[in-house]
Amino acid sequence: MKMYEILELSNLYNSISNVKLPLKTSYKFARLMKLVEGELTFYQTKFREIIEEYGVKENGEYKLTPDGQSIMIIPGKESECNVKLFELRNLDVPIEGIKFSIEELEGIDISIQELACIMSLIED
């Protein structure tokens, strides 16, 4: 599983965490999130390090892009920063021991994008 899939999995988990599911399915999701907890912490730490290295600061605060959607990157360093972020998001993360059957996921309404992030965990 790639790190970006772990991030999407975390978002899926947050969106369904209050949905009542069969015990076995809930248990598997809880175990899965426990497994990836350390990976999420690792990602957040590395992401902060990259932003610390490449982000533009003004008065001790990160400066936002004109659209206010992201942190401004040091001019001339955008490509280098993007490569590091790409590498971080594409790290391989081994997830073993947890598989879902389609039947176990039947009570969950999810989008195709959300389904894509758990496809590698589904047994046909």
Label for each model-derived stretch:
Residues 44-124:
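Low-complexity intrinsically disordered segments
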Residues 2-55:
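N-terminal interaction modules that seed assembly of large macromolecular complexes
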